[in-house]
């Protein structure tokens, strides 16, 4: 469940931006012969619907119906009492409420065209019960998987999304800078990071830690207290207006000087070669995450990713890498923008 501020800013996400995104989607729908596109959303898979409407659910689930010739309609399992909140925080032609979102969406579409051609982004990931309700609500509707249609459109970041990612990254930088330093417990550091991120307007923030990099470099959620090693890593995952980024830093327990400049330069050099993985040769491990359809930070490629997904030009991603400098373990990460063809990729902000 979302615990931070969910609001809409027309200065940061103007109607013209949503209009341009919808126009691109509708052009692809027209070429594919689709009458409508369906996108599923919940509090963990919000990045498809929020990209087209600004809507981010704090809980529950919904289906966005994007007709080829009309404005989008949201069919939400949330109760009617939050209707005005949904309308304030998003741009939608209509909000329909009902517990069976598949049935309601299909009935609405079938009422206008009984044999409409419907594309569903990430059909394989849609719950079987919702698919069954779609078929019950519109027995003559033609349902097909529209993942290949939607994914390339969603992957390419426009200037508005890049600006939101920069804002999220600035929140993460400021939050990580609040780590108390020598003598502070891990719990105190995490609390300070969360408090600052929420004060700065984060929609959501999650903090993960690797308490002792000499023993284990895996990041995890900390329950209770954990003893700190000579160096430890903290990762802030921040959401702002539907855009998610990760920022990871390594900290010395005793406040000793770290090779920050050399470490940041090595990460930036590896990122510059994306979408090729060549820059990460020699790293202990690495990971690139980003949005394909609805999950905001899905694993796209990395040393432990079995099936890699090609990075689209102008894609926003978050990169994390594990390596050593002068014998010291370092875990670093930052958001990045993949270049267009022939251009180098670049970090949006440095990790330190």
Identify the role of each PLM range.
Residues 1-352:
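Active-site neighborhoods and metal-handling regions in enzymes and metal-associated proteins
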